[in-house]
Amino acid sequence: LLMTGVESGRDAYIAKNYNCVYHCFRDDYCNGLCTENGADSGYCYLAGKYGNACWCINLPDDKPIRIPGKCHRR
């Protein structure tokens, strides 16, 4: 079955370059960041696996997410 024009999304930590999360303290910051990148919404996940970081709901597949491994800062 081939479906065209259908976009899928995932719930995940949105990532910067080098596999790093966006740290946060406020939900409105993350909601803005996530929706600007095509997600339905977002919030600041407090004390999560990567500390306080932005979590997006239904983030498009073409946007980077945090994957296992280190954050490689420049």
From Swiss-Prot:
One of its GO terms (biological process) is defense response. Disulfide bonds join C20-C71, C24-C44, C30-C54, C34-C56. GO terms for molecular function: sodium channel inhibitor activity; toxin activity. Expressed by the venom gland. InterPro entries: LCN-type_CS_alpha_beta_dom, Scorpion_toxin-like, Scorpion_toxin-like_sf, Scorpion_toxinL, Scorpion_toxinL/defensin. The keyword Secreted applies. Its main location: secreted. Residues 73-74 form a propeptide. GO terms for cellular component: extracellular region. SMART domains: Knot1. It comes from the Eukaryota. Residues 10-72 form the LCN-type CS-alpha/beta domain. SUPFAM superfamilies: Scorpion toxin-like (SSF57095). Residues 1-8 form the signal peptide. Keywords: Disulfide bond, Ion channel impairing toxin, Neurotoxin, Secreted, Signal, Toxin, Voltage-gated sodium channel impairing toxin. It is found in: Secreted. The keyword Thylakoid does not apply. It holds the Pfam family Toxin_3. Belongs to the long (4 C-C) scorpion toxin superfamily. Sodium channel inhibitor family. Alpha subfamily. Has the structural arrangement of an alpha-helix connected to antiparallel beta-sheets by disulfide bonds (CS-alpha/beta). Alpha toxins bind voltage-independently at site-3 of sodium channels (Nav) and inhibit the inactivation of the activated channels, thereby blocking neuronal transmission. This is Toxin BmKaTx17. It comes from Olivierus martensii (Manchurian scorpion). The lineage of its organism: Eukaryota, Metazoa, Ecdysozoa, Arthropoda, Chelicerata.
